Amino acid sequence: MLWARGRQPDHRIRMSQQTTIRKLAELVNTPVDKLLVQLAEAGMKFSGPDQVVTSTEKMKLLGFLRRTHGKADTPAEAASEAAKKITLNRRKLQEVTVNAGRTKTTVNVEVRQKRTYVKSDNEGSGRAAPMTPDEERADILAKLAASRQRNLDEQQRLAESDRARDEAIQRKRDEEQAAKDRVEAERKAAEEAAAAASAPAPVAAAPAPSSAPAARAPSSPSSAPRPARPAGASPASRPATPARPDDRNNAAKHKTRGSHVMVAGVEDDDATKRFAGQLHLSAADRARRSNVRGKPTGRPGSSSSRRNDGGRGSNQSNSGPHGFERPTAPVVREVAIGETITVADLAQKLALKGGDVVKALFKMGVMATITQSIDHDTAALVTEELGHKAVRADNADFEDALLAHAEDAQGETTSRPPVVTIMGHVDHGKTSLLDYIRRTKIASGEAGGITQHIGAYHVETGRGVISFLDTPGHAAFTSMRARGAKITDIVVLVVAADDGVMPQTKEAVAHAKAAGVPLIVAVNKIDKAGADPLRVKNELLAENVVAEDFGGDTQFIEVSAKVGTGVDTLLDAISLQAEVLELKAVADGRASGTVIESSLDKGRGPVATVLVQQGALKRGDYLVCGIQYGRVRALFDETGHQPASAGPSIPVQVLGLSGVPEAGDDFVVVDDERLAKDVAQQRETKRRESRLVASATNRMEDILAQMGKGEGQQVLNLVIKADVQGSVEALKQSLVALSNDDIRINVIHSGVGGITESDANSAAASKATIIGFNVRADASARKIVESNGIDLRYFSIIYDVIDQVKQVASGLLGVEIREEIIGIAQVRDVFRSSKFGAVAGCMIIEGVVKRSKPIRVLRDSVVVFEGELESLRRFKENVDEVRNGTECGIGVKAYNDVKAGDQIECFERIEVARTL
């Protein structure tokens, strides 16, 4: 550009003399080549820098450059540029209500809007010849006039629209006010008619106590008696008699002194109301102020809610019927109570003070503060105790609607694979049987050769797909077996032919019967020597499990998990039972099911093993699982593959939840993450409230228990971390069950995953022992454990955990002092000694009597003295002990009342270690 090097584009060029191109370039400080290019772009061709540039050519070049930079070359062009821009300004007044403390304040706000419209210059680009300046100016003026006319029309249209809207609003308000006035007039007419019908004869006014009030009485129209209005008279037919300020003052004075008696009748309030409004306000402002002033601030029947329309400070009386009547009977309220409620909320619903409810709870034996939550039963009892009625609150919220919608899954029902749970006693071959069916080696990889969590698999056989759940057989995993029986279709009870029915076998039968699930008995280890299938059938008869060949309906299949004998027959029995059950489910739509197991993987986060029962679970679905929620990031089957979806009766692992869910929780797929989060938070709130109520109850029971037992009970604190949720649950139940009157096992924290720094700090603060079941501590946790001397123990078999905790608890119990009788001597005669006093001549009839051991003197089998054996002699010789059948002399220290026929019992105190 010509003016690019720091110069303004409007520098003037001297045009009084002819100038060459080179000189012009020096003058404007621009290279010659660039100036030649700009001259060529302006339509002027020069052959060299020494040619002369005329003033006309300079002006032409200047105009070209100004147009290039967006500036008008001439005043006409400037006017044309200005004509292309139109600016509209608009002002609008409105009112905004803001909160100022307890009151609301109205603020006037002015909104200013400014818009600029620029007309494009595309229309003139296609014309062949440019217009003359006059024609261009006339055209621009015409367009400007048309634009102004359009703007005026638009403004007029907007003004008319605003006016019509305001008129409609005002008309609606007038109609509402007229309706209110009409209803008020009818109500007052009815009240006046009722008052006139029930009023006694008019009472004459009492004589004035002084002459001054008597002189003013005739001039005051309000003090003169007024005739009663007919019953059918309307308030609108009365004459308008505005009340003067002195009338109101006189009325106030008479009311204060009590010197006049009110005359039967109704005060004429309409005349005062007619002049109560402020005439200088608009209808909208008057309505707004009347709403603010007339808003009731107290209870119904209070003075603030009965304020009339006479304005501030009005002293007009109202002799109509009173708005509040004192109840003649106690008010019985119907109180809706949920699962939990705080004492303060209950007191508010009962319209009582919180202290009254707390007193009632104390009388019932419940100690609670005003902020403490109580359960529904306690709240219902105290409500009935206070004379009110308690009803259960309707908890029909969006969660119930969601679950109901999930149960009514859309789509056609199709046949689904059966879910088979394998149950039985420990080491009876459950996992080995499943290994043979799946052609895998799971049992060899289990710690200790026993299953310690639920395994979920689906197997494709020649008879169709079958889903298997392998449950632990150890006594500690009762809840796991109950959970497996709850979600299953068929229970396969594995019983070892050489071992027979064991305790967990009986428990599995009880779980199957409680769940109403058909039972198939697999008599395993049939290939071993000493196998007796008939014994198994006879023992199960005691549990009401009758075989088909005994006339019952339970199938007994003899199998061998080692060599595979009878496995095909077992699969045929499962398929036959599934056909009889006619298992069906919805294959499409929202998925729902149950969590079988859950764990925390360091690399993948929370992992939940779920069994789909309805619908199809796909990657990307939003699901709610107990108090956890999330989006399904990945699905894995038992082989580690990632299926696209999982249908009914298929177990899969789900990744993407917000936390580790509880085993046994139900899951359901929802539409979006927000709904899932709301449902999970509501469940968490309910669970927290229930936990607070339970903890408060347990805390009170602990206080009472400590008061009764004193401080003799020892407490062993534990922190339990395991690999899966089911193991945590089993460990807690088994270890807490070890508590007795002397020691209490207290699990202060438990969870899934590795031992973290937080777990170590909790153990250090409570002096607890950390138990890691198939998990390890990280570096930071190990550092805290070493610095604080925390007892950290790792386990992989649940037997070892229980045994070790028993040993630790036994160490806390200390030792027990026991007394063991070692010998009994019969007193035959008593001798006197100057040194020892009375000496008993005795015969040892049982055991051995030793010197310096404690003794008891028994007379007629009653202890009369307890002391120490001071002297033991035989043939005048001191001996250390005398055995059975030998005579001896015994000197009892500090006791001289020994008689013939007494028995001397010798015993010793020994320390015995206490165990659980």
From Swiss-Prot:
Family matches, as HAMAP family: IF_2_B
Annotated stretches, region: G5: 560-562
Name of the gene this protein is made from: infB
Ranges for domain tr-type G: 415-584
Chain positions covered by the region annotation G2: 449-453
Cellular compartment(s): Cytoplasm
A GO CC annotation given for this chain: cytosol
Matches recorded under InterPro entries: DNA-bd_dom_put_sf (IPR009061), EF-G-like_DII (IPR053905), EFTu-like_2 (IPR004161), IF2_assoc_dom_bac (IPR013575), IF2_II (IPR044145), IF2_N (IPR006847), P-loop_NTPase (IPR027417), Small_GTP-bd (IPR005225)
Presence of the UniProt keyword Nucleotide-binding in the record: yes
Leader peptide range in chain numbering: none
Region (G4): 524-527
Alphabetized CDD domains for the sequence: IF2_eIF5B (cd01887), IF2_mtIF2_II (cd03702), mtIF2_IVc (cd03692)
Region (Disordered): 151-262, 280-328
Residues the record lists as binding GTP: 424-431, 470-474, 524-527
SUPFAM superfamilies assigned: Initiation factor IF2/eIF5b, domain 3, P-loop containing nucleoside triphosphate hydrolases, Putative DNA-binding domain, Translation proteins
Protein name according to UniProt: Translation initiation factor IF-2
Family, similarity comment: Belongs to the TRAFAC class translation factor GTPase superfamily. Classic translation factor GTPase family. IF-2 subfamily.
Biased composition (Basic and acidic residues): 151-191
Gene Ontology molecular function: GTP binding; GTPase activity; guanosine tetraphosphate binding; translation initiation factor activity
Residue spans of biased composition, Low complexity class: 192-243, 293-305
Region described as G3: 470-473
Species, as recorded: Xanthomonas campestris pv. campestris (strain B100)
Function, as annotated: One of the essential components for the initiation of protein synthesis. Protects formylmethionyl-tRNA from spontaneous hydrolysis and promotes its binding to the 30S ribosomal subunits. Also involved in the hydrolysis of GTP during the formation of the 70S ribosomal complex.
UniProt-annotated stretches for the region G1: 424-431
